[in-house]
Amino acid sequence: DDERLIEKSGYFREKWYLRNYPEAAGSGLAPARHYLQEGWKKGFRPSMQFDYEFYLNTYPEVNEAGICPLVHYEREGRRKGYFPNARQLYKSIWKQNRAGFADRLKFWAAKLGLPGVKKPAYLSLAAIIKNEAPYIREWVCFYYLNGVEKFYLYDNESEDNLREVLSDFVSAGIVEIINCPGKAKQVPAYNDALSRLRYKTQWLMIVDADEFMIVNGNKKISEFLKDYEKYAALAVNWVMYDYGGLLKKPEGLVLENYRTVHGKFHPKNLHVKSVINPRKVALCVNPHYCEYKGGNYAVNENFEKVVGPVTAVQSIDKIRLNHYYCKSYEEYEAKVARGLADSYFKYTIKKEDYAFDDATEDYVAGRFAGPVRSLMEKGV
């Protein structure tokens, strides 16, 4: 199946492949079969049009999964809006960056303090969600208390009571829920938010509903960002939490229930998510990585340049992104099952994903539980 798939893809060029990799011609294998069995593992490109290194560097989950890049692109990447080469990426960037003159004028007029012009939000948040009602109120309350003024939630066919759970935030104009049906909509949703909000917010945070960004100290996120305004983005490292020995979904808040994390040097902790200045961002390429406009770049908490979706080391002395990937074992099982419906590739339960061998205690999020619970109960 995969052999026929890549032959029909338009990105496997048999003559080009044989000309550039003579060992394939002498292998006794059909060119496509050689690429699938041996070539891609050696870093061979299927054609000039499909850039092997670009694809793996831009979408690190492909490398982690050990999947042939071209097969991944045809089975999953294409419908997710992934790019097979840098040329197509930059073509999309050009199309994305044509904001209307009126929006630009309003933004800069507000920045100058001209009368009668609504001031843009300082910090907004965009996320795509599906069936997150049991957790979403805690998450929204947490970020609202930490300086997020406006939430743009892309609802990917939720079947729960999302709008009811957030009704007070919606009525107050703090949360806007945007219908976003279909599969593989994460990156398209982020780019829609980038286009919508380029001149409506100073900063745009792009995170998932299981991620909580925490400043170490007394500052809100919005206050912490003041020192980074000359940069295109602040890239924040993950801190990965496991199930903490909980087999069933517990009572209480996510912030207080989970207290064990991967050790500092685990590669999962090297991934970043970013708070971006949307006027300096050309395109969201994947959930962990944006392309920036002419000379602009992201930095970490120490003002060190960050290139790509991962960092060389985890840096979380000032700010971190707690990632409650699995929660309890019961919830992890349900998450794996949900993932199957949105992917050609089979995801299975792996003990190392929910019970970390290198787990250490970490409870920095606990201090937020009281204020968050209070806001959840009283509302806005």
Residue ranges with predicted function:
Residues 1-111:
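Charge-rich, low-complexity intrinsically disordered regions
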Residues 88-141:
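N-proximal low-complexity "stem/linker" segments adjacent to membrane-targeting elements
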Residues 141-179:
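Acidic donor-binding segment of Leloir-type glycosyltransferases
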Residues 156, 181-182, 208-209, 217:
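Short acidic donor-binding/metal-coordinating loop in glycosyltransferase active sites
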Residues 182-188:
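A short, glycine-/small-residue-rich helix N-cap motif at loop->alpha-helix starts
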Residues 188-190, 215-380:
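Catalytic-site signature of metal-activated, phosphate-bearing donor transferases
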Residues 191-203:
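Active-site nucleotide-sugar/metal-binding loop of Leloir-type enzymes
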Residues 201-214:
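Short beta-strand-to-loop acidic/aromatic patch adjacent to the donor-nucleotide binding site
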